[in-house]
Structures are given as C-alpha cells and as structure tokens.
A protein has these predicted regions:
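Alpha/beta catalytic cores of nucleotide-metabolism and tRNA/nucleoside-modifying enzymes
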Residues: 2-4, 13-15, 19-36, 60-79, ...
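Short, structured patches in soluble enzyme cores that scaffold and shape functional sites
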Residues: 7-11, 40-43
Length: 207
C-alpha cells in the first residue's frame, strides 16, 4: 500500500462486542493492508448514549486490547481510553506498542513535558511553563494579525498550569478576556503575570 493507513476503533459496538467480533474486524482490515490500530478500550453504544457518555460510561477493558496485541504481534497496537498519567502510560507500554492520551493531555498539557525524559531517554530538562508561554506569544500575535482570534489559541492552554498555585486565576483571566473582540496577546501576558509574577517577585526579593 503506497500510503500508510491507520484505524482507530473501539473494542465493540452495541451488541457486537465479543472478542471474536473485534478479532474479525481487525483481521479483515489488516488483510487489506492496515498495520496500525489505535484501540479505545471501551465499547460504543450508538443508541442510548451521547458522545460524552460514550467517553465515560462503558467500562474500560484494557485486557482485551492486550490480548489483541498478543494475538497479532505483527501489528502496531496503540491503546487509548481513560489513561490519566505517565505512570499509567508506562504500565501499558509493557503490553502494547503505544499509548494515546486524550483528555488527560488536553486538560493538563504540561503532562507531555516529561514524555521525552520518562519514555524516550532524553536527558535534557523540559521547558518550563513560563518558557512555553513566552514562545507562544509571537505565535499568537502572528495568528491574530492574520485575522484569527486569540481565543482560538487561548482555549487550548487553560490547563497549562494545572495543579500549580494560582492556576484558577490563570484560567479565569483567559476564559473571561480571550473571547472578547479585539483581544490580543496582552491577555496572555496578563495571565502569565498572574501565575508567575508573584513567584518572580519573591525570587528577586531573595537576591
């Protein structure tokens, strides 16, 4: 096959949720040339559950994905669904080829800062949140000057300071000010000052 094809699927759909159903599906698609499958370890209810409920209500069955990989060592099997930390990701990597982080990475994007060190052996320290924000400023400025809106970017970094002091103030400032017409990178600078300003001031005072 000249173009790589990947498939993302659930472990089952409605009443077609046996291991035999999953095996039949994967074997058929693999027979057509697909070598990579990203498998969400929940079944999907197409009738009766909303998309949001389908992400939370059906129980997770990681073991079924592990058994799929064991049955198909020649395929790349990537597991997805409810994985909330790098510790969990490492545990899954003992059984499958890859891990996909969805909501966890979106709600706490700085979670990814440790991936290279923890999972890929990179010895360099990760960029700080402050450095990430500073790098984002010129990018956001170009986006706005090209006709985009600040909120197109700001809404994706609400969780950057997840679990850190003053994270709520950071989120609130972006949520309130970034959607407004005419909002520019000053909103990002103000949000950054809310979380890092007090810390930087205390460091300067200690010198």
């Amino acid at each position: 096959m000249p173009v790589p094809v990947t498939v993302k699927c659930r472990i089952g759909i409605d009443d077609q949720d046996s291991e035999a159903d999953l095996e039949r599906f994967v074997s058929a698609v693999a027979g057509a040339g697909c070598r990579t499958f990203m498998v969400h370890a929940r079944k999907a209810w197409l009738h009766g559950l909303s998309p949001k409920e389908n992400r939370e209500v059906p129980p997770l069955d990681y073991g079924r994905v592990y058994r799929l990989k064991a049955a198909h060592p020649e395929l790349e099997i990537i597991i997805n669904g409810g994985i909330a930390s790098l510790d969990e990701a490492e545990a899954h990597l003992a059984q499958v080829d890859g891990v996909a982080l969805g909501r966890a990475a979106y709600q706490n994007p700085y979670l990814l800062a440790e991936v290279d060190r923890r999972l890929l052996g990179d010895s360099s320290p990760p960029r700080s949140r402050h450095t990430v924000m500073e790098a984002l400023l010129p990018y956001a400025d170009r986006h706005i000057k090209a006709g985009g809106r600040l909120n197109n970017i700001a809404r994706h970094i609400l969780g950057l300071y997840h679990g850190r002091p003053r994270a709520r103030a950071f989120r609130r400032h972006l949520s309130e000010h970034a959607p407004r017409g005419g909002a520019d990178i000053r909103v990002l600078e103000e949000a950054l000052q809310l979380v890092d300003g007090p810390r930087l001031a205390s460091l300067l005072a200690a010198e």
